[in-house]
């Protein structure tokens, strides 16, 4: 089977030849692996056989990016959302948030007027080169993007945003719908230009270690209409939807299923997202991607990661509906040798 066939099969809750494989190592992790033997001339996704190719566009207000300060350890930059962040030079951690452009409701309209669909939001040469290569290799090609709470953190401090979601949900809903509409129009434009996607991969972190960052009721007031609108568009174009949402998001899974979500990712283990429990509870109502603990990957005892993969694959792969991925992304404390072992085990226990 090709990757395209394999993933389509899994998302239909049918059993392919083996579990599809995809993952997300950090840039700092890849740099470490190159020092430990990953060939410089082979992209990591090619070396390990990742099966999903993402093609996106710029969904931001496109403010200029400026470097304000650079040291041997840190870099302070503005972003295309108008924010200012401080990062380690290797971008190996979540950035420190220094400033955000929206502090009050009056700050939103000047940003909103910049969020319009435009052909220049897509790097067409790169997009078509990526698309044609991926299509020739039989990959599963998705349109990527994201709107909602996670994206809005690029405009507002998290605490201010969370308070606004409760005190003025209609305003937050307007911000989310504005971004969702931009995504819909841009996908429409890309499809009309010849990018025939196999699916969609959207990002919106809504959880943390202990649960949702906001209540299911707040999700329904602020997010649900926008999510359903874009999901409906995707389904009309035969594009199953994978949603990346970190943390524990169990409480809104029924809402996500109701509006048409096909697959939930990444299933953070430390947040209580156990793929075995989720698979047993939702069966063929939802597919799952991820759930393999990166802490087990970094454990010096090789039996730990083997048991992690064996025990979870045993349940998750039955009847299809599962794609391998780490339970978030691969940090730099996982060695090249350890990760090669991970993929060996995925192939061993992922056979049908």
Which residue ranges define each predicted feature?
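Surface-exposed flexible segments
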Residues: 34-42, 88, 92-93, 338
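Short active-site-adjacent helix-start/loop capping segments
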Residues: 29-32, 62-65, 85-87, 151-152
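Active-site loop segments of alpha/beta catalytic cores
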Residues: 1-36, 76-78, 105, 109-352
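Compositionally biased, low-structure terminal segments
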Residues: 48-49, 64, 89, 129, ...
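A contiguous, low-structure linker/loop signature
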Residues: 64-117, 137-138
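Short, solvent-exposed loop/edge-beta patches enriched in aromatic
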Residues: 15, 46-53, 69-71, 137
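Segments that shape or occlude catalytic/ligand-binding pockets
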Residues: 32-66
